[in-house]
Regions:
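Rieske [2Fe-2S] iron-sulfur-binding domain
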Residues: 1-77, 81-91
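C-terminal catalytic domain of Rieske-type non-heme iron oxygenases
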Residues: 62-66, 70-378
Length: 378
């Protein structure tokens, strides 16, 4: 934000600008954030007697990291190194964002707003396989959902790893990574590219030996992923990947940013089919999207009522009354973290626990910078 009056300086999705100019009073900054110009500096401030331009710059992000082309920023100067914080979820993040030595090609984002709290979408993608055969029944009825059918969601595992969690589908038995990826519609060239970047004991073992295909996931707090493979025509399925951010506007409204992702070196025909599959299912007009949002808006609306304040919702799926899990950890799951087969709300509880821990943590005691003056304040 501009150091003058706090206006947002950059409002474009992408570009190649060499400078950034605040639209309010035209203060201008170089691409490295340093202040380049102040209109009427002499007349308005008496030059450096009123405001020293030298050495002024936009506030830098305290912590920044890049993985697979994605930029992650923390505003906490005491945040641990990103890879340390990401932990075991790095394994699953690579499925969605590292499928080729050429990198991933993104389209978007689509942006729209929903009258729902941001945490509902985040926790849904983290582990709610239970809703699929019910909320998305209409999608099944028209034949959009190919194999595996939604009622087989209970055969997949729910995993928790580091600050993230996700869902999987169980693949037909006896396959390897190539047959598993062909089963969900991947082109042979795309499979070869993925094998070139995935170590044999990593994702190929999860898909091949364990027989699980990653589906939806969330990285705390508000970054989600979805991988699905609907029918595009005559029984032929096409896989797609979507990356999405749940950006809070307020407690009752969320801006959704949704990107389509595909291997950059994939054949043009595969990219076209994959994008078509994405648009059918997700994005502002996707059929899955519309089903989900109707639920989330209703939950947010009823949560405002007096009756909702009297109710402690039950989020104990997968637990006995004494708090022990109904099923143990899956014995031969090739991915890192904790994995349990069947329905449960283990992942939602994990995500909300991380959120509660973040709220309890005191904010860092940082000095306030006084721009243009020779002092900082606490």
């Amino acid at each position: 934000m501009c150091v003058h009056r706090g206006m947002q300086v950059c409002r474009a999705e992408r570009g190649t600008a060499s400078t950034f100019r605040c639209p309010y009073h035209a203060w201008t900054y170089r691409s490295d954030g340093t202040l380049a110009g102040v209109p009427f500096h002499d007349e308005a401030y008496g030059g450096d007697e009123g405001f020293v331009k030298e050495g002024q710059a936009l506030l830098a992000a305290p912590a920044l990291a890049i993985r697979n082309g994605m930029v992650f920023v923390s505003l906490d100067p005491d945040a641990p190194p990103f890879e340390e914080w990401l932990g075991d979820f790095a394994f699953y993040l690579d499925f969605y964002t590292a499928q080729s030595p050429a990198g991933m090609e993104l389209r978007g984002p689509q942006r729209w707003r929903i009258k729902a709290n941001w945490k509902i979408g985040a926790e849904n993608f983290a582990g709610d396989s239970y809703h699929t055969p019910h909320t998305h029944a209409s999608v099944v009825e028209i034949g959009l959902f190919g194999e595996p059918q939604p009622h087989k969601r209970k055969e997949g595992v729910l995993y928790r790893a580091g600050p993230g969690a996700g869902t999987t589908y169980k693949l037909p038995p006896g396959g390897d990574v190539e047959s598993g990826m062909r089963y969900v519609g991947y082109h042979p060239d795309v499979i070869a590219s993925a094998r070139a970047v995935w170590p044999d004991d990593g994702l190929p073992a999860l898909i091949g030996r364990s027989g699980f295909m990653p589906s939806a996931a969330t990285l705390f707090p508000n970054l989600s992923f979805v991988h699905n493979w609907p029918e595009v025509d005559n029984g032929r399925v096409a896989p797609f990947i979507s990356i999405r951010q749940w950006q809070p506007v307020g407690p009752g409204e969320t801006e959704v940013l949704s990107w389509f992702a595909v291997a950059a070196d994939a054949p043009a025909s595969f990219k076209a089919d994959s994008y078509r599959a994405y648009l059918m299912c997700f994005g502002s007009s996707g059929m899955f999207e519309q089903d989900d949002v109707e639920n989330w808006v209703s939950i947010t609306s009823t949560a405002r009522g007096a009756m909702a304040r009297r109710l402690l919702l039950n989020s104990r799926m997968g637990l006995r009354r004494d708090g022990t899990p109904l099923v143990g950890e899956y014995p031969d799951f090739a991915g890192p973290g904790s994995a349990r087969q069947g329905y449960g709300e283990h992942n939602q509880r994990h995500l909300l626990s991380l959120w509660a821990d973040a709220l309890r943590r005191p904010p860092p005691d940082l000095p306030r910078r006084s721009f243009g003056l020779d002092r900082d304040e606490r």
